[in-house]
C-alpha cells in the first residue's frame, strides 16, 4: 500500500476506549475539528470514524466472546462499518476490512515493535507523514492485567517518541496518564520536583523549550486569570452558552 497523500500534513484524532475518551467528546462539543478521526476497535461503534484499526482477526469477535462486553458492539462494527478497517486478515463476512500495510510500514519506520493495536495506528500516522496526532482514550489502566498495561503503554510511548523525533506534534488527552500527561506540572521532572521551587520545562508560541520556576509560573497563571476574568482550564468542561 502506497502512502496516502491526503494524510500528509493532516491533524488526526486517534481515539480508544479508555476513560480519557471523555476529552475527545468534550473537545467535539466545543467545536474542535480534525482532518480525520481514527478509532481503535469498539470506538468505531460510538463515534464516526474515518479509519478504524482492529488488529485482531474479525473471527475473534464473530466466532467467540473472547473480547467480553465489547463483543456485541464489535460484531456491529465489523459488519456495518464501510471501512477502511485495518486488520491482520480479511474476512468475507466483513466488507470494510483492509489488510494493514505491515511490511511497508516496517520498512519505512525500520521497526516492528507492535504488542497491541494502538502502535499500529501510530506507526500508520508516521508512515503517512501526519503532522499532528491527538490521542484520546489511550490510558492503559487495565486492572486485571498489569503486565499487559505496562507493556502496552511502553510500546505506545516508544512509537510516540519516534513520531516526535520525526517532527510530528503529539498531543495527549489531559485526563490520560500517557507520557505522564495527568501528572501535576510541578511533579513532572524527577528530582526537581523535590525542590522548594520545582523547575518546569515549558514550550513557547514558537514551540521552543524554556525553563521556569513553579512559583513564577503560578504567579503568571494567576495574573492571566485575573486579566482574562476566567479560570485558565487545562481540561475541557461541558460547553455553556454566552447568553441564556
Give a label for each model feature.
Residues 1-244:
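Metal-ion/cofactor- or nucleotide/acyl-coenzyme-handling active-site neighborhoods
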Amino acid at each position: 500500500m502506497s502512502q496516502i497523500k491526503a494524510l500528509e500534513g493532516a491533524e488526526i484524532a486517534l481515539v480508544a476506549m479508555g476513560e480519557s475518551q471523555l476529552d475527545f467528546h468534550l473537545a467535539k462539543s466545543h467545536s474542535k475539528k480534525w482532518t480525520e478521526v481514527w478509532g481503535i476497535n469498539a470506538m468505531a461503534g460510538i463515534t464516526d470514524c474515518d479509519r478504524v484499526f482492529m488488529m485482531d482477526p474479525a473471527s475473534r469477535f464473530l466466532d467467540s466472546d473472547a473480547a467480553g462486553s465489547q463483543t456485541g458492539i464489535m460484531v456491529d462494527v465489523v459488519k456495518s462499518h464501510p471501512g477502511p478497517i485495518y486488520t491482520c486478515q480479511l474476512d468475507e463476512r466483513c466488507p470494510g476490512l483492509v489488510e494493514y500495510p505491515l511490511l511497508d510500514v516496517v520498512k519505512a519506520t525500520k521497526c516492528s515493535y507492535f504488542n497491541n493495536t494502538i502502535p499500529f495506528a501510530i506507526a500508520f500516522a508516521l508512515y503517512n507523514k501526519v503532522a499532528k496526532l491527538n490521542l484520546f482514550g489511550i490510558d492503559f489502566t487495565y486492572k486485571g492485567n498489569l503486565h499487559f498495561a505496562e507493556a502496552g503503554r511502553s510500546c505506545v510511548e516508544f512509537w510516540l517518541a519516534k513520531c516526535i523525533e520525526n517532527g510530528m506534534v503529539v498531543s495527549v488527552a489531559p485526563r490520560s496518564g500517557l507520557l505522564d500527561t495527568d501528572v501535576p506540572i510541578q511533579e513532572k521532572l524527577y528530582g526537581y520536583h523535590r525542590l522548594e521551587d520545582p523547575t518546569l520545562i515549558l514550550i513557547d508560541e514558537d514551540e521552543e523549550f524554556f525553563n521556569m520556576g513553579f512559583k513564577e509560573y503560578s504567579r503568571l497563571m494567576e495574573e492571566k486569570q485575573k486579566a482574562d476574568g476566567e479560570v485558565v482550564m487545562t481540561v475541557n468542561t461541558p460547553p455553556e452558552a454566552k447568553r441564556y
